[in-house]
Amino acid sequence: MTEQQKFKVLADQIKISNQLDAEILNSGELTRIDVSNKNRTWEFHITLPQFLAHEDYLLFINAIEQEFKDIANVTCRFTVTNGTNQDEHAIKYFGHCIDQTALSPKVKGQLKQKKLIMSGKVLKVMVSNDIERNHFDKACNGSLIKAFRNCGFDIDKIIFETNDNDQEQNLASLEAHIQEEDEQSARLATEKLEKMKAEKAKQQDNNESAVDKCQIGKPIQIENIKPIESIIEEEFKVAIEGVIFDINLKELKSGRHIVEIKVTDYTDSLVLKMFTRKNKDDLEHFKALSVGKWVRAQGRIEEDTFIRDLVMMMSDIEEIKKATKKDKAEEKRVEFHLHTAMSQMDGIPNIGAYVKQAADWGHPAIAVTDHNVVQAFPDAHAAAEKHGIKMIYGMEGMLVDDGVPIAYKPQDVVLKDATYVVFDVETTGLSNQYDKIIELAAVKVHNGEIIDKFERFSNPHERLSETIINLTHITDDMLVDAPEIEEVLTEFKEWVGDAIFVAHNASFDMGFIDTGYERLGFGPSTNGVIDTLELSRTINTEYGKHGLNFLAKKYGVELTQHHRAIYDTEATAYIFIKMVQQMKELGVLNHNEINKKLSNEDAYKRARPSHVTLIVQNQQGLKNLFKIVSASLVKYFYRTPRIPRSLLDEYREGLLVGTACDEGELFTAVMQKDQSQVEKIAKYYDFIEIQPPALYQDLIDRELIRDTETLHEIYQRLIHAGDTAGIPVIATGNAHYLFEHDGIARKILIASQPGNPLNRSTLPEAHFRTTDEMLNEFHFLGEEKAHEIVVKNTNELADRIERVVPIKDELYTPRMEGANEEIRELSYANARKLYGEDLPQIVIDRLEKELKSIIGNGFAVIYLISQRLVKKSLDDGYLVGSRGSVGSSFVATMTEITEVNPLPPHYICPNCKTSEFFNDGSVGSGFDLPDKTCETCGAPLIKEGQDIPFETFLGFKGDKVPDIDLNFSGEYQPNAHNYTKVLFGEDKVFRAGTIGTVAEKTAFGYVKGYLNDQGIHKRGAEIDRLVKGCTGVKRTTGQHPGGIIVVPDYMDIYDFTPIQYPADDQNSAWMTTHFDFHSIHDNVLKLDILGHDDPTMIRMLQDLSGIDPKTIPVDDKEVMQIFSTPESLGVTEDEILCKTGTFGVPEFGTGFVRQMLEDTKPTTFSELVQISGLSHGTDVWLGNAQELIKTGICDLSSVIGCRDDIMVYLMYAGLEPSMAFKIMESVRKGKGLTEEMIETMKENEVPDWYLDSCLKIKYMFPKAHAAAYVLMAVRIAYFKVHHPLYYYASYFTIRASDFDLITMIKDKTSIRNTVKDMYSRYMDLGKKEKDVLTVLEIMNEMAHRGYRMQPISLEKSQAFEFIIEGDTLIPPFISVPGLGENVAKRIVEARDDGPFLSKEDLNKKAGLSQKIIEYLDELGSLPNLPDKAQLSIFDM
């Protein structure tokens, strides 16, 4: 294709062929296109036979930019072969060429008014005076020439000349003519472009290219669909359908796009790929796809060599409607038992998914009952409000009796004189109601000896299960001729007499004895009982286990054949004999004293927990539930949170208590007790739950329930108990996930917990069931009864529950008497101290503006709390750095909460208080003002002010809740935290709680582990799906690193949230909020008392030097120099392998920021603040400010760096403050600009590059935060420049963690070579090696400045701090790799007791490992220290 043909194709593509002159169309050439994929730019080089008319030129440029806007930023460079009338065209193009420069809109407007003369290749621009001439010549000469040349003009020079009267007169008519033609050209171009847009829009409507539904290729026949799991090899043509769970649309270098989607049909998953086709609207169809949509796809199955898996290369794809699960019942049920992702490592979906599904099915209400926690409540409330459904709040807890008796049926019998029958039963199962005794064995004990034995089998008249045979080693053959149980029990009762029964886990064995006695008409046994299991738990509290096997070993008793009754009995007897002696030593002498004298506060730990459902009935019930949850997590936590029955009874008001699942007390009673006892227990509850038979299938599989018939009988007994007690029986689903196919995720999570008892059995189907599904589950009860328990009773129970709101809807701040007055007085007092009694009006106006908002909105107390915390830290000798936007508040400055002064840059005289403010935006920071002396008294002036609007802190109306974040020294942080307890009281302050969920990487490990254990192979796409299913489930709890929640004195914590220990660590110093702190962020005050290295380092530098950091000059020239060159450190770039001197300087030491420094070479404080803002923002530097600076459009000081810059810049540009604030807020949140904002900015001549920059930004850093960080950084840098050893000692002590001492003690050349080698291998370095490299970079710099590192010194090294000796540093013991804090302390303590005599002595006294001793030896730290001490004759 010729270059002329290429030009025609281009003209056709951008649809302007009909608009161009025929000669130009036929003779124009597209000579080349320069493409930069990195910068997304295309530059078209076009040769034309003559100049385009100005309006055609504008049309061409607009059309080509529009056509390729989604692909790249397009520019054009024209060459005109016949430059006839160049001077005439230049005049017409003048305005357009000016627009291509980086001048401000205002200056561009001025320049366009100038007259010009074209003479050959020289363009003269007539200006008014020499000032204009110099300004224009410097500002735009080069860029204006470039703009003309890009348009095809052959121009060598542009000259700016001053006008004289003759020139003005001669050119007046020409100026008017040019202006008229410019306006006409612009109008014609605009009309043509609008016409083209309308035609294009019409064409799009006709072609339906803006698609809502994806449809590419041919329709796919449904009969060709095959399950994804059947795809196991490459195939030519396959059709599948599935739901999208991941999608990725990428643009290729060629300009085409590829869509990669992952779909599943729940048999397996597959990756599908497709490229956009030429001249098709595939991209629009790809964009119509999204996660959750069902598609039908057809294509070729092939092996993808990159992911090493089968993928489908699609030829056809269509979006389809998939039938969703419906609840078809006319009357809907209410679910009262379900678990969300907050049920730790057990539930799968978040509560929002359940609520949405229930609403879609038309359910009137839904409950949430997570295991032991209520952390889903805030999200449940939000979801219920969103979907218009009633939310029922509840929890499934662990109920325990307050004290589990050791002795039953107390007898007045002296223990040493008593006769005991130690016995054991073997049975066909665990239920004394449904299973039978097959062996009864006992020994009689008196005076510490076994005096008789009893051993009998009994015939159950049924075959034993394999489980029982394996457990007891009793076979059916052994029981064939055995007597009936009636005979055995009668004989046994007579043999026992009035002896005291003893058994291990006596409640089980006595349950079978009492049930047997009652069936024989004897009534329950009246003999005393002692349970050796509970006895051991009480008197052997140091044991972690109390099983018979374990106790036999501990007591030295032989147990030859566990789970055979006679052997278990004899072992228990010998253990019990020794226990009687233990009880005697504890003062327990009589059977009736055992429970009383051996009871303790920890009795709840011995009780076996039963599940219980607690439903909140009203607002009082919510608070009571919060109290119960808190007590169970804080006071009664033992392996799991426990709820003593007395605690539940105390706080039962407003709660409905349900029987929960098969682990509930009532279900267990049905298995172990007769009906009268079951009904007695049932009366404790407000409702009885029965769950689908499918959920109990594992009990049948594990032979805990005999069969389905027995299970149905259990249901009937539960229903009868409810009817008798007048308690509603409801069917609950015990849901752990939404749909059947989600169950695999729960299996994976359970399998990841080796100790979880659920691993012992097959997990039942626990999906969220529809009404018709539940009715079908209980069809065996009959239609009427099934409807009653599934629909009628659940709805009636839901109607008894009031609307409950778990989260407050307003902020409750603490009260401090006189806070308003104190903040006002403190602000003015410090302002007068700084600015004088006669305050400048700008100071008064700012204070009054802020105080009106702060006091008017009740925020004074927040300021006062922060002031007290900062003052305490300052009084204790630690500086505090502010974070966030608090430095935007002048009141915060005057109350000494922050050092950042947000007023415009200004001078202040420390003596006569004269001040001078710069309000025009000409100075970025007061610290950048030149040094100056007071004209009145001659004193050096103080320089202050960072020019930050107050609105960035409390919002434009000043009513946004202040978020005051403070950086305390890391070592002082615990003191600051504890000081809040002094201010408010221990029961009013809590750490802000967090919830840790399963991360994607962790979930991947779980999935891989599960598949490996099961011997299952799955392709990568299916693994990705399973990972997504497991991600986000609660794994643990934690605490915010510095967040303290303050409860006002007129409320208590339970008005907002329950409390707990982080990660259930009962030894934690602080309790946390049970809710994630974000949930209550708007209801209670959160103080961010964070720990930071900078204040700690400043404190150490102050201690070493005696220099008050507040006296350090911020504009020290040598300090400023290190941000662009290392010269002031006395080293070269080559020596330290870096072009700046900022290694180890906070905010400026990372490779990323050092590169920014190299690119920008900042010289002022305000520019350093810009760097800090640019480095912390998202899409603020890369692809944005960086390109603007590189291309010369603007410099570092004028790019957008911090969020506040936007508001200040726009106000200086003439925008109303309210609009400037709106724009700043929109941009900083990544929301871009609205049409109204863009229009307003253009009206005020804001340049296009500024608008473009705003549109790219995703997140911005507050200027106050950046200023506070830079202030700390500059102070630390001051020590680096002027007091090097103090700096290096502090840096290595405070900030460094990984050391290579072997390298660090070498000469500077060796250290440099090591650093250089690590740079060459950087991409292969692990995290630890990269941390070591950071330390070696600093060490290399230190060495080239003439200082060195000594080896560890046994005599001089400290535990944790680097110390200075001459021009060297001595490292501490903690710097030795692998040596921990305790060992470091121990070495110093041992050294204080006397010198180490040998390496063996060092090992014994300090506990050093051989590996560390060898390291110290290699380091040269153990000179002349022998391996073993030599005994001298003089020591004898």
Curated annotation (Swiss-Prot):
Cellular component terms per the entry's GO annotation: cytoplasm
Catalytic activity: DNA(n) + a 2'-deoxyribonucleoside 5'-triphosphate = DNA(n+1) + diphosphate
SUPFAM superfamilies: PsbU/PolX domain-like (SSF81585), Ribonuclease H-like (SSF53098)
EC numbers for this chain: 2.7.7.7
Enzyme class, first EC level, given as a word: transferase
Location of the protein in the cell: Cytoplasm
Swiss-Prot/TrEMBL GO biological process terms: DNA-templated DNA replication
Domain Exonuclease intervals: 420-576
Highest taxon, organism lineage: Bacteria
GO molecular function: 3'-5' exonuclease activity; DNA binding; DNA-directed DNA polymerase activity
PANTHER family per record: DNA POLYMERASE III POLC-TYPE, DNA POLYMERASE III SUBUNIT ALPHA
NCBIfam families per the UniProt record, alphabetical: dnaq, polC_Gram_pos, PRK00448.1
Descriptive protein name: DNA polymerase III PolC-type
The organism of origin for this protein: Staphylococcus aureus (strain NCTC 8325 / PS 47)
Species lineage: Bacteria, Bacillati, Bacillota, Bacilli, Bacillales
